[in-house]
Amino acid sequence: MSGEEKEKVKILHVANISTSATRDHIYNMFNYLGKIQDLKVYPSEGNITANTLLKTAFIKFDDERCVEVAQHLTNTVVIDCAIVCLPYPNPVIPDEESFFNSGGSTTAGQRQLPPHVTNKIQESDDGSALLITVDPTLEQLGLPAYPPLPADTDSAKVEEIRRTVYVGNLPKGVDGNEVLELFNMYFGEVMYARMASGPDALPCAYAYVEFSQQASVCNALQNDGFEFKERPLKIQHSRVAIIKPQAKTDEQALGEIEEAIRMGRNGDDRDRRRSRSPRRRRSPSPRRRRDSRDRDRDRDRDRRRSRDRRSRSRDRDRDRDRKRSRSRDRKRRSRSRDNKDRDRKRSRSRDRRRRSKSRDRKRERSRSRSKDRKRDKKRSRSRSPEKRRDKEDRKTEKKENENESSLREKLLEKKAARKDSSDDEWEEKPTPTNGEVKNEEIGNGDVVMASE
């Protein structure tokens, strides 16, 4: 086994456990964090006495990261006590006898620095006492040593400060969750982170980050100048501890538990009174009557408180419903406006398209009519010479016909005139006697055939 594996803390010390909690309770509570190799609960069942007030437990996990996560369960109420979860630096769970003989306590424990990290008091030049923390790992890695603290600083605060680093040169307005995720991912398990924007004149923000393990401080210091949102981070030792929210005390946790138990007991009493038959009821004694009156007063007080709580809860629910209703109405109105605007835009767009189409159709009709008119004009121009020629031909033909008819009439007249003249001559001449046919010249050389 290497030295690095030896330094890994895999054992969790759980203190301030209620005596009513069993081993199964503790196992089921921490088993979901990771695989448990071993679990010891002290004092054991055979060693619990009437003077035993609390229990303590040691849990060995298979993975050291489970120890880091389990520390966030500190102040979780189990039965009637708020538990405290701390890493146990030794590699082996102590047995019960050696644990109690060495002064081990079952009450709320206190976190300790790793064994190789030591504190010592040293006087400064001006005579004041300072607390110096020596970590050999920082020296080996060439990292700056822990800054000195006042000698009267509480040991618990010293341990917290030595697990905390200062982070500077953060962008203004940066989200704290982003810083938390960054350090969790690259440097180590973070227990707390506190953001500070600083004065307006300061060009950057800063933060304090507290790790679950002191060894994570070395990882963070080695990454001084880490690039985050195009800015080099300034990572240094912190001189102060993070101011944390007030933890719930045992008295507060116990008061809440007693209130819950009393409410449950009152409910059981009411159920028992309803189920009790009239025959089993007895006349109460004066003492019982006083106790009954006290219980009635307690019940009335509890009922009033419960009614008040329910009333406040109903008021909150009504307010929440009103807000949701207003939000829904606003969303509906917004959607309605959006739909109307969208419909108007669509209608305008359709109208524009219709008008555009109508204009296009009109243009096309106009162009078509213009083309038709031009075509007709061309046709009329091309047909007019033919018409003129036809008309002239008809006139010429008519004239020829008229000329022919007039000429025919003239010829007929001439012919008739010739005939009349030939008939007159025929009568004056004697008839031939020889029976021969003679040719006679008649006007203009026409030949006429005559028979006997």
UniProtKB/Swiss-Prot annotation:
Residues 259-272, 291-305, 383-421 have a biased composition (Basic and acidic residues). Extensively phosphorylated on serine residues in the RS domain. Its main location: nucleus. One of its GO terms (cellular component) is nucleoplasm. Residues 273-290, 323-335, 345-360, 370-382 have a biased composition (Basic residues). Residues 10-91, 163-240 form the RRM domain. The keyword RNA-binding applies. It comes from the Eukaryota. Residues 258-452 are annotated as: Disordered. GO terms for molecular function: RNA binding. Keywords: mRNA processing, mRNA splicing, Nucleus, Phosphoprotein, Repeat, RNA-binding. GO terms for biological process: mRNA splicing, via spliceosome. It holds the Pfam family RRM_1. It is found in: Nucleus. InterPro entries: Nucleotide-bd_a/b_plait_sf, RBD_domain_sf, RRM_dom. Belongs to the splicing factor SR family. This is Probable splicing factor, arginine/serine-rich 7. It comes from Caenorhabditis elegans. The gene is rsp-7.
